[in-house]
């Protein structure tokens, strides 16, 4: 998605009404310094300098959705204790609707205390009740869902296995969503995913998907196998598996998996990143985005979230800025690899056939142009990988290139047959091919198919290699020789 499309999405988000059903908790952070060892035991002494109390669990989903601009209501159970009162007050401050919030006198409101020093967690202390909610609370939630589900555009289920999401509650949620045509988006937990049957989409991480499916995920084939099994037995519309540094993989029930690479960045804390994913994904589906576009924006948001310490929200302007990063001119065809990866994932999600070729393209001539035009004719999108100046020098000698990389890139981008240009500094485009996953890999007729770099990668994904003959007598070297001999 381009920057303007993302901005338009967030403008529409302000009218969305979301219901969050799940386990609420408080996240307490004690920030300090650990510069000495206790004389009482061989443990660090943390001198607390700052304390911070935030909404956690399903509360962090509420926090994220509110930060993204939509109207949020809560359906859950807390204790009639001090932490419950603090949690209720925090939700009220976010403007959340609390008609579906129930209390139990004997229940302990979940609170997780994290002690940090030098931006590192030292210990976590949990205070909580994990047993299922009382029958009266369960019936209260079911009645609330029956009466109020139609008031919302999306239902978000945040399961932390703290007892709120009983089988009866989950059944009521999924039934309401199906009957009313409302997306039900679930962040699952535990080994038994049968309780989520009938939801719209689940967002497990790789490890959770392995446990739930019983398939060890080691490559693309096993990933697809795990996803297919879960999709069929749970009657889902789609499955989104988050894969840490490998990004996300979206598996629609109708077929056509979409793999969304992550944007490389320094990771400070993954706490709450899953809450960010489900919040943005849910909002996207409620706004009518395709599954692929909603997942793509969620991936961008998650990349921002892991760069922050603690359960933090991601603001719309941060996501918009990240989408625009590396592409100051939104109309430019010249992209860095991270930005291009997102663009190509979106093209794939639309069923477009992506063609990739590469070269130095130093002193562009008619042979190059005809070659590129033929390559474009093989598919819908043509991506050209362009060797940087350093790469050209290693391949062709210190006197090359004649034209520096920025100018070569702009010359190529001016051709109508080219959709994207990406520079690469390596001797081969293997990294680019692995990242983009083109459907067709094109090289000149002087190559053999077996010798084309990246062939195995493309063919393993169901793609193919094509060889295109060059125009006889046309080459940069011959042009240089003619200039030297004639002038």
From Swiss-Prot:
Which Enzyme Commission number(s) are listed?
2.7.1.167, 2.7.7.70
Catalyses which reaction? D-glycero-beta-D-manno-heptose 7-phosphate + ATP = D-glycero-beta-D-manno-heptose 1,7-bisphosphate + ADP + H(+); D-glycero-beta-D-manno-heptose 1-phosphate + ATP + H(+) = ADP-D-glycero-beta-D-manno-heptose + diphosphate
Q: Cellular component terms, GO, for this chain's entry?
A: cytosol
Keywords carried by this UniProt record: ATP-binding, Carbohydrate metabolism, Kinase, Multifunctional enzyme, Nucleotide-binding, Nucleotidyltransferase, Transferase
Residues annotated as catalytic:
275
The first-level EC class reads: transferase
Q: In which pathway does it act?
A: Nucleotide-sugar biosynthesis; ADP-L-glycero-beta-D-manno-heptose biosynthesis; ADP-L-glycero-beta-D-manno-heptose from D-glycero-beta-D-manno-heptose 7-phosphate: step 1/4; Nucleotide-sugar biosynthesis; ADP-L-glycero-beta-D-manno-heptose biosynthesis; ADP-L-glycero-beta-D-manno-heptose from D-glycero-beta-D-manno-heptose 7-phosphate: step 3/4
Please give the Gene Ontology molecular function terms for this protein: ATP binding; heptose 7-phosphate kinase activity; heptose-1-phosphate adenylyltransferase activity; phosphotransferase activity, alcohol group as acceptor
State one Pfam family annotation.
Answer: PfkB
Q: For the region Cytidylyltransferase, what residue ranges are annotated?
A: 356-487
Give the GO terms filed under biological process for this record.
ADP-L-glycero-beta-D-manno-heptose biosynthetic process
Q: Where is this region: Ribokinase?
A: 1-326
The residues listed in the UniProt record as binding ATP, with positions renumbered to this chain, are 205-208
Indicate the family of this protein.
In the N-terminal section; belongs to the carbohydrate kinase PfkB family.
* Oligomeric and partner information: Homodimer.
Q: Briefly, what is this protein's role?
A: Catalyzes the ADP transfer from ATP to D-glycero-beta-D-manno-heptose 1-phosphate, yielding ADP-D-glycero-beta-D-manno-heptose.
| Name this protein carries in UniProt | Bifunctional protein HldE
Source taxonomy lineage?
Bacteria, Pseudomonadati, Thermodesulfobacteriota, Desulfuromonadia, Geobacterales
């Amino acid at each position: 998605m381009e920057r303007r499309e993302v901005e338009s999405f967030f403008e529409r988000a302000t009218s969305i009404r979301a219901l969050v059903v799940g386990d609420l908790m408080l996240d307490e952070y004690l920030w300090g310094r650990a510069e000495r060892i206790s004389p009482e035991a061989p443990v660090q002494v943390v001198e607390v300098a700052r304390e911070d109390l935030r909404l956690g669990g399903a509360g962090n989903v509420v926090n994220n959705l509110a930060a993204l601009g939509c109207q949020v209501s809560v359906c859950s159970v807390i204790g009639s204790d001090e932490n419950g009162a603090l949690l209720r007050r925090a939700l009220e401050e976010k403007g959340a609707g609390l008609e579906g919030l129930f209390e139990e006198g004997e229940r302990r409101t979940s609170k997780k205390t994290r002690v940090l020093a030098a931006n590192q967690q030292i210990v976590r202390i949990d205070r909580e009740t994990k047993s299922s909610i009382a029958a009266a609370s369960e019936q209260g939630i079911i009645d609330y869902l029956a009466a109020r589900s139609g008031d919302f555009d999306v239902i978000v289920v945040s399961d932390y296995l703290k007892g709120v999401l009983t089988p009866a509650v989950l059944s009521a949620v999924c039934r309401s969503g199906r009957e009313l045509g409302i997306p039900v988006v679930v962040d699952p937990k535990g080994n038994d995913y049968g309780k989520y049957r009938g939801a719209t989409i689940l967002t497990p991480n790789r490890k959770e998907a392995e446990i739930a499916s019983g398939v060890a995920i080691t490559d693309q084939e096993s990933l697809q196998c795990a996803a297919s099994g879960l999709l069929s037995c749970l009657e889902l519309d789609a499955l989104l598996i988050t894969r840490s540094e490998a990004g996300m993989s979206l598996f629609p029930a109708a077929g056509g998996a979409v793999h969304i690479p992550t944007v490389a960045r320094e990771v400070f804390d993954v706490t709450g990143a899953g809450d960010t994913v489900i919040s943005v994904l849910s909002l996207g589906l409620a706004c009518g985005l395709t599954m692929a576009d909603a997942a793509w924006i969620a991936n961008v948001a998650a990349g921002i979230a892991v760069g922050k310490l603690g359960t933090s929200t991601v603001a719309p302007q941060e996501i918009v800025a990240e989408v625009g990063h590396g592409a100051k001119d939104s109309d430019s065809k010249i992209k860095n690899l991270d930005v291009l990866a997102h663009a190509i994932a979106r093209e794939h999600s639309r069923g477009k056939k992506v063609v990739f070729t590469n070269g130095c393209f130093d002193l562009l001539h008619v042979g190059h142009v005809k070659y590129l035009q033929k390559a474009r004719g093989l598919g819908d999108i043509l991506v050209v990988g362009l060797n940087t100046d350093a790469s050209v020098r290693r391949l062709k000698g210190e006197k090359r290139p004649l034209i520096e990389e920025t100018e070569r890139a702009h010359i190529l981008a001016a051709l109508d047959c080219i959709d994207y240009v990406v520079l690469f500094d390596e001797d081969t485009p293997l990294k680019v091919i692995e990242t983009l996953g083109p459907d067709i890999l094109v090289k000149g007729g002087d190559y053999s198919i077996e010798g084309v770099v990246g062939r195995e990668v493309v063919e393993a994904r169901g793609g193919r290699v094509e060889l295109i003959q060059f125009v006889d007598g046309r080459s940069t070297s011959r042009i240089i020789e003619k200039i030297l001999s004639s002038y």
